[in-house]
Structures are given as C-alpha cells and as structure tokens.
Amino acid sequence: MATLVSPPNFCAKEDAEALRKSVKGWGTNEKAIISILGHRNAGQRKEIRAAYEQLYQEDLLKPLESELSGDFEKAVYRWTLDPADRDAVLANVAIKKSTDVYNVIIEISCIHSPEELLAVRRAYQLRYKHSVEEDLAAHTTGDIRKLLVALVTAYRYDGHEINAKLANSEADILHDAIKDKAFNHEEIIRILSTRSKTQLMATFNKYRDDQGISISKNLLEEGANDFQKALHTAIRCLNDPKKYFEKVLRNAIKRVGTDEDALTRVIVTRAERDLRDIKEVYYKKNSVPLEQAVAKDTSGDYKAFLLTLLGKED
Amino acid sequence: MATLVSPPNFCAKEDAEALRKSVKGWGTNEKAIISILGHRNAGQRKEIRAAYEQLYQEDLLKPLESELSGDFEKAVYRWTLDPADRDAVLANVAIKKSTDVYNVIIEISCIHSPEELLAVRRAYQLRYKHSVEEDLAAHTTGDIRKLLVALVTAYRYDGHEINAKLANSEADILHDAIKDKAFNHEEIIRILSTRSKTQLMATFNKYRDDQGISISKNLLEEGANDFQKALHTAIRCLNDPKKYFEKVLRNAIKRVGTDEDALTRVIVTRAERDLRDIKEVYYKKNSVPLEQAVAKDTSGDYKAFLLTLLGKED
C-alpha cells in the first residue's frame, strides 16, 4: 500500500498556475510546492508538467531546479519525474559517480517487475542515448560487472509456476558455491539473473529448509567483500523488497549525518507503491514510527516534503 | 526488399475455407496450401489463423502438422507462425537439441532490432513459461554461455549517434584481445553485447582502417574454436546480415545432403524482409541464381514451397 495522499479530482491547469506563482513570485513559496506536488500521483504530475509546458513553454523541472536547493530540490525534482525516467536518472547518477551503484542498480533490476525494468531501460536510452547496460559495463569491472550487467539485462519470466525439482537442484548448486566460497561462481549469477522470482523464492526456501539457515545469512557468515555484499543485496531485493527497504531506511537514518540520498530515494520511489507496508516493517523492527525517525533526522522544507510523501496529514 | 508476393486484397475467411478443404478432403492438396499460404504476409496469415479457429474451433497449425510431413511440413508450419513466435520456436529447438544453437541465437540476437528481439523474448515466455536466457544459460556452459546470454539479453540503444573517440579506443581493445588470443576476454563480450549497432559499425571500420584487415577475418586467422566461431558469427550478423545469410545459404546448399534446417530457416525468416537483397548477394558470389540452386537441391512440395517464398511466379 502507498502512503501518498492524492485527490481523486484535480485540475492540472490550476496546479500549473499555482506552481508558476510559487516559483516565479517574490521569493519561492516552498509550502505551496509541497502541498501541490506532494499530493499528486505519477499520472497527475505528468498532466501538470504537460499543462505547465503548454502555458509557459518551459519544463516545470527547470524552475524547480533553479529556485529550490539542496536535499529539498533533489527530492522534489526526482519526485516530479516520471517513475521510469526517475529510475533512469538514479541509475545514471549511481553509475557515473560510482556511489551506491550496487544498491541502485540492484534495486531497479531485482525489485521491479520485468516490464517495469524494461521501461527504465527505455527511459534511460531516451535520456542518455546509451543503454544502461552499456554505461554500467563501461564503468564497472570484474565479477561485480558480470553480476550487475546480468541483473539489469534480465527480462525474467513473470509467471507463477514452480519447478520443485529445479528449486531443489539449484538450491544445492548455490549451497555448494557458497560452501566452497566460490561466490563469483558463474552458476550463482546464472540462477539469480535468469530464473523467475517465484522460482527463486522456491529455491531460497529449499535452501533454508535444507541448510537450516537462509541463503542471505549464510552468505554474510562467510565474510563480506563487495561482491558478496552485492549478491546479498540482490537476494534480499528478490526475496523481500519491503524488508530490504526497511533496512536501507534504518541505515540511512542511523548513520551519523544521515544518508539523505538513500532516504530520499526510498521515500520518493516507494511513496506511490508500498511505503505504507515498509513503514509497518520499520515500526516492528525499531519500535519508532518512521515519520518520527525521519522528522528527527531532517529539517525545513526537506523534512516537510518527506513527511508529506510519508502520508502526514497537513 | 522482400521476395514474398502477397495480394493487397484477400479474404481470410475464404482462405480458411480453402485451407480446410485442402487438409480435410480426400488426400491433402499441397498445391493449394502452397498457393495460399505461400502468398500471404504475416498479418494476413494471422487473420487466416484467426478465421480458421473461429470457423472450425481448431488451430490451423494442427492439421498442417498432422497432414503434411518432412521438410515441407516444417517449412509450412514455421512460415505460418507469427514471426516472433517462430523465432521463439527456432531458439527453443536450437537450445534443446544443442544443434545450431550458436547460429540461431546469434541471428536472433544480433540481426533483429532491439524491439524485435524483445518481441521474441516475450513470445518465448508466453510459449515455454521460461525466459529464453534462462533456458539458454541452463543448456550451455563457459565462455559460449557468457557470450550468448549477453547477446540475447541485450536491449541496445537504437539511435544513430557515433562516438568516434569511443570507436577508436574500443577498436584498440578488440585488437589487443585478438592479438593476445584472449578471445574470451570480457571486454570483447561487453563491447559486442552492449554497444549500439551504429557504434559497433564505426568500431569495426576503425579496426579495419587501423589494422588493414577486418576484425572478422582477423579473428579467423587466429584459428577457430567454437567460441571464436561464435564471435565471428556475431560480428558478421551485426555488421552485414545479408552477406551473412548468403553464406549460410551457400553452406546449406553446398553441403553433401543439403542442410534443410538452415535452408528453411533463412528462406522462411527472410522472405518478408530482405530475401531479395540476399538473392542478389548470392548471385554475385555464386554466379547462379539462388532459385536455381535451391531447385537443384530440393524436390517435391518442399521445393515448390521454397521457390514460392523466393518469389517465383506461379
């Protein structure tokens, strides 16, 4: 379930006019921007951008970028983008800066449905005139490259059939590789990057039943270099995205100084999807409501915007 | 240019009725089947199958399969399929039988446009409840697997921009790998499987200008194990599909006993696309018209059907 609160009825033209006043008037009216954009779903934001473009011959993103600043600007800008295009931007920034590249690429590859991942690949090409795998492969090396490129180019079967025999044999293959510390074993990459999510779930369950320990825990027990961490992230994203995002939020908030990039990423990308469920998991694990934790670690317009996306009533 | 001759006006229902008579009457009327299906394009065949299904509650493919036989049956059956579905069948047969797997997978991966390749991947999933990369990865190993999976999962940028600097540096990378006989070098696979076709063309041209020999010739000069052959095929398919298909036809016909599978594959898959151009290349290289060579090597209904697809007037 989503946290975003958006009105069933809205007028794109009125919103565009109100936003124009907010960015072009005497001083920027951040509150108005938050109260409009923070309450519009992807389809509505798209209509608002189109209306704004038609009225003022300018992309709404331009004044948002120039009039706002810092984490608030980044959050509003990313939120306003079309979701697939936003993921393309996130992927490109991660690849170019080589920061968080594993996490961002793995999230996009392993959490999205096959069709959603494809939409991101399309959006990436439209925006950057390259394929995402092309840029990713050119900016990474070795085993990590093999894993990430295989994951991002996957177009998994999306059906719900389970082949129990296969789950059995591939749970063994995974365990043998982990036992032998052959983490970069081609078979691990093959299985994680080609099997359907339903099939993988069955394989991971079989692994846990056979070994008495989950594959993700087993992986980390054996130490954790970058490649193992990436594998671990992929398995978590494939297996239980909500639990995974809870952990990302927890780490982002716990860190001295707060990891705003991760915080913004999770809230902006999940607000229209499953942020309500992630909030629940967060509360169970931390005994503190997510809103409260976010409010404590952030401030000003950035805080107000994140809390709005988190479903706070105005 | 295509060789297929199909009427602008046709009636799917009439065709379906005529085909019904041809397969269900006293003795099968192969000539009628050839004269109808051999003159209908993909859209028309689709309509005929739909009309047949509606009239007789049966897929037209069923009687075609049961009433026809041998190479003729295979050719008519594959021709009647929707093109993306046909490629899915070709890929699956190649993967399962491990025959011609390199050629078929590389053709589909490197000759199709990114969207066409995607359509084949979708058709494959619909038909087999697996992804093509999943089956391919499970049935191959080692370097060949790396290459084929990377090619079949590609969703290349389809634009026409060329980055000359990149072509320069990647021509060098390719040459260094070939010079060192490091054919399985990850960089070769990365470049071939991620760069756009336009960019690759520029890279191959730069290679030829720098080295005085084309990359495909250079590859074969260094000996030819299976992996090198697969690389060679991929480069030819990316670079000049018509020349590549001419060679496939030449080899299929020259072989003692004729390679009907390859012959059928090229004619059936290219008749609505560029078979006229391939015929021209064939004539230039062999001084014998392709129709004549095919007629000499085949017989009966199979021969009549292939010649019809090759554009022979009735």
Curated annotation (Swiss-Prot), chains A, B:
User: What residue range is the signal peptide?
Assistant: none
Q: Where are the Annexin repeats?
A: 10-81, 82-153, 165-236, 240-311
List the record's Gene Ontology CC terms alphabetically.
cytoplasm; plasma membrane
One MF term in the entry's GO annotations: calcium-dependent phospholipid binding
Q: Which Pfam families match?
A: Annexin (PF00191)
Q: Which keywords does UniProt give here?
A: Annexin, Calcium, Calcium/phospholipid-binding, Metal-binding, Repeat
Residues that bind Ca(2+) 2: 253, 255, 257, 297
State the InterPro entries in the record: Annexin (IPR001464), Annexin_repeat (IPR018502), Annexin_repeat_CS (IPR018252), Annexin_sf (IPR037104), AnnexinD_plant (IPR009118)
Q: Does the keyword Calcium apply?
A: yes
Q: In which tissues is it expressed?
A: Predominantly in developing fruit.
Q: What residue ranges carry the coiled-coil annotation?
A: none
Q: Where does Ca(2+) 3 bind?
A: 298
Where Ca(2+) 1 binds, per the record, is at 25, 27, 67
The Gene Ontology biological process terms listed for this entry are:
response to cold; response to heat; response to salt stress; response to water deprivation
Q: What is known of its domains?
A: A pair of annexin repeats may form one binding site for calcium and phospholipid.
Similarity comment: Belongs to the annexin (TC 1.A.31.1) family.
Q: What is this protein called?
A: Annexin-like protein RJ4
- Origin species, per record, is Fragaria ananassa
